Amino acid sequence: MANDFLFTSESVSEGHPDKVADQISDAILDAIFQQDPKARVAAETLCNTGLVVLAGEITTFANVDYIEVARDTIKRIGYDNADYGIDYKSCSVLVAYDKQSPDIAQGVDEGAGIDLDQGAGDQGLMFGYACDETPELMPAAIHYAHRIVERQSELRKDGRLPWLRPDAKSQVTLRYVDGRPVSIDTIVLSTQHAPEMQHKDIEEAVIESIIKPVVPAEWLKDTRFLVNPTGRFVIGGPQGDCGLTGRKIIVDTYGGAAPHGGGAFSGKDPSKVDRSAAYAGRYVAKNIVAAGLAERAQIQISYAIGVAKPTSVMVTTFGTGKISDEKIAQLVLEHFDLRPKGIVQMLDLLRPIYQKTAAYGHFGREEPEFTWERTDKAAALRAAASL
């Protein structure tokens, strides 16, 4: 890649229909985990105008009112009026959960199947990434895209901009010089709004009250602002588009700055390595960068269903490493247990912590529950690398 370039990432608000689905799925997971931390959950959600469909595979002894959980989630997001696209009070909720296949369960249950350790819940490949572009060790474009829609939600909920509605999308294009971000070329924010609002008033409020408070002022050099570029955004949420769990996997991770293995996160308990190993990958990569071993770090981890040990672990630092990538990979294997059970224990994942992850990014947020954001291995890695 050339050292001078433009790079873009997007985010969406909690009221985006796909994120509504993600949050319902993770709210279901949390409600189950409050009673049964060892449950097997794969909760999928579809939401459309006035309709929510809950489907997937759940094996648990927990007694959960799934319909009430879905309604409470929609209410918390802010869809309390049918004019907004869906109303938690009047929407229909259909429940169609099956149990986990026993063929899968025997490969995941510890002490069953061919590998007596807890095996991976499926085959697949997962990526973790970190870089030094922000204090959170996240790529800058996705970081600021998240902060913009997070700010939109804040001003909507606290009443400072009461004409805002729940659905919104942001996009940030950064200008890089010599491989480092130096300014913002373009910011896009499309936000749902009350029908009586005029475009010029929306544009002014968005730029001054939403965007400027959360992006570096020194990066706003000849920046182009595109606010509701279609001119109107009244119909939104599940009425504007059908929402589905797992359809915002790039928003959930690194905004396209790193590869993605394809597996979504929300609604999945941590026996699914799609989720738990991606969290572990972030934990590993962030500690590599925090230790000063590299300015950028990417790890790929892969698994076979029913097998505990990863089938491969690869680290690349894009030429920024202080020691070789092979040496860093060896340190990773020595300091991190990447077997499914090891990940669950290392990151304390059998807790009802997941609904909070389902909007504004699973990574790069300093929340106390987000154990994969800790840098508690950095000192040991640095010492082992003799730096």
Swiss-Prot record:
Chain's gene name: metK
One Pfam family per UniProt: S-AdoMet_synt_C
The protein's name: S-adenosylmethionine synthase
Protein residues bound to K(+): 44
HAMAP family hit by this protein: S_AdoMet_synth1
GO CC aspect terms: cytoplasm
Catalysed reaction equations from the record: L-methionine + ATP + H2O = S-adenosyl-L-methionine + phosphate + diphosphate
Binding site for Mg(2+): 18
Keyword Transferase: yes
